[in-house]
């Protein structure tokens, strides 16, 4: 408190004899004196910012402990009680260091240090940008300030980021200001994200419901108050024309800067957040329900900030207000509204001329969409412009892509601006009262309004709406209405989860019964389970009463002039919207148009203005065609004609002149809403003779040899006959030219057949030639035990193959069956004679069907995975050594089929009992393994055969078309014709002696 005033020539010893007035403050302990702007003018003194001193006369300098520019007048609103200013001054006087100039030698006391974790150890260097010559002085000035404040220091770091100069908001006198910024774009791309959560703005605002008084505190140079971790300081390096520097404090522009600062401020105010204040990065709001409590709450927050040596910008702070600006909103005791300054900036924006400007406008308005009733509807013409060709445009290029608003989009642009300017105040939620959630859905959007009863008046808390995607547009009406409820509950979860009663109002009465136990719709059942998380009471509200939510979901479609044009009076439109149920405005009620000719419908109504009398004919059996005269008379004649000719069970085709479409639509909507009707304007020739049909199909097919679907569409332009698709498919399926030269678009997928299961190890052996690191190996795997072995092979010559095969069969004790692919070396007489001498059956996989020999192919895949990992872990080992190690690792690992190690099964290492026990144990083990193999095979085949068919059977002499897989050119035949000699269920043997898998045959 000021006790008295002193006036005198206090600076006379320094050469200035001006009378100076000082006010005595006994509680001022941080300084000997504070000089204001008027005193500086009287002294004609100069503040030397660089040297932090006051120059009274040339040669006389006074060191300054602090310097600041503070506008004291707006700290309090005028309507506060008497004495409030004195209480505030006293409170601020308790914490003088909080309001000292930025970074005046103090260190923030917090456990949080700013670090930059990157996914690479390589220094990130970006070339400097050339900035304007006339800005060099400004850059040097700002560099000097940062050096003086201890924010940066000279650097010799290998890292580098460029700087740029951007304009700031001008001073009140119009003087331009600039800010030096560092572009950390390249550093940010390699920075590991800090996942610390930033508070949800809507949840924060919703929690201020019972408060009456507010104080907002703005932290001075927020990020610069946090020290950088010493090891990460070099990463912040940047260069200018006069040197290179690095940040000692957290700079602006780093990817993780907001999360780091939020962690720091949460650490400092942890005990008070949610009780007396909320924090969003460097913005703090202190709240209370009454005047006296507010001083206590404010003192607690200031004490915590003072203890941590954080500094507050007094100019941007507001104390003890009933209405404050916070996070772009105006927070009052009555509720929340949009910030008029932000709204004014939006209202003054010109129409966008580029994609970037359009997205910027939509982003700004979307921030306030909770205030805009029916935002999805109003903004839809603009959001449509960001899709299609403009959807994948990069942000850096969006400013170069021009865009033009049509009349509808321009109207949407102006409507959004005008609605924002007149938006109402949204109420705070009261969590002790029931919530009202009113929802509605249309064919293109869903919407809802959350409200509560306030003294007999239903006050809105939030408006929400969104457009439906393509999948959701195909939902049934009841599913769309349920989706509106589910989406609204999820979107408003911060308000509704754990709340008391939630009354959900819908204008779709069947929905109130769909939540019962007799509902068999799986999708609705799943959604019902999600609704049960909330304490909901579903209430039917007729469309007349459900105006707001109904409007949120109404985005009127373009009806192509099929209905009467609405008057350009928005009041009339809203009046009709408020007094009619949403279903009556639904475009899905209009009779759809189709491209097919009227001939395809079994009941055809052809209206003709030139016809004088009615005629009924039957172009085909089961088809009826009504030729009806149409005159410009009353609606009764047209209604009577439709009543007598329409059939309620089947789809009716109608051909009517476009001039009478509107009349026809209105009659159908009023009298025939449940009938299936399609409108078309096409009539083609009927073809009934079998020979004529075959000739037409043959002529069209030979023209381009297209498929049945294309031929049908082509013929429908001129002709129609019943069962067109099946007739065309049957006739074209026998075309030899198509079978030989066309691709097989739907290849055969015969069911996978079970393969023989061995009873013991070494009964069935799979072999293949395997190349690795310029060496050949004979790969062998026992089908029973899954034990594998690689034998070195000198070449694929039959003599070398026979030598290696002898070694392998000796190791595996001559199996009963040997499975291999079509390796030529195995077909030579010497190898075949050797196998016959050992009584070994050789089974060949069909040509180019290596998957039939899948046991060894699957082993190769697993072996290569192990080999590559070993090669990385043991770089000094030779490839041959790695091969042996990899095979050993495979054999000593548990196999997923047998649940045992292949080596244990193959060598029976697990048996360590007496002879009799060994035999019984061995027998039981083999039976268990066989059962596992059989089970895995059956289960695998069942899963893979879901989309496959039973193999087609062929008799001796049947023609089959075999794929020419060896052909490398595209102009030759894709298939060749062969005759079947023997059908082996999954393969066929042709008269040429070759075996083909049935998946290689044309359907």
Swiss-Prot record:
MF terms (GO), sorted A to Z: endonuclease activity; nucleic acid binding; peptidase activity; RNA-directed DNA polymerase activity
GO biological process, one term: DNA transposition
Occurrences of domain Reverse transcriptase (ranges): 147-331
InterPro entries, A to Z: DNA/RNA_pol_sf, Integrase_cat-core, Integrase_H2C2, Retrovirus_Pol_polyprotein, Rev_trsase/Diguanyl_cyclase, RNaseH-like_sf, RNaseH_sf, RT_dom
Recorded catalytic activity of this chain's protein: DNA(n) + a 2'-deoxyribonucleoside 5'-triphosphate = DNA(n+1) + diphosphate
UniProt entry tagged with the keyword Manganese: no
Gene Ontology CC terms: DNA polymerase complex; nucleus
Residues in Integrase catalytic domain copies: 752-910
Pfam family, one: RT_RNaseH
Record bears the keyword Protease: yes
Stated name of the protein: Retrovirus-related Pol polyprotein from transposon opus
Gene name in the database record: pol
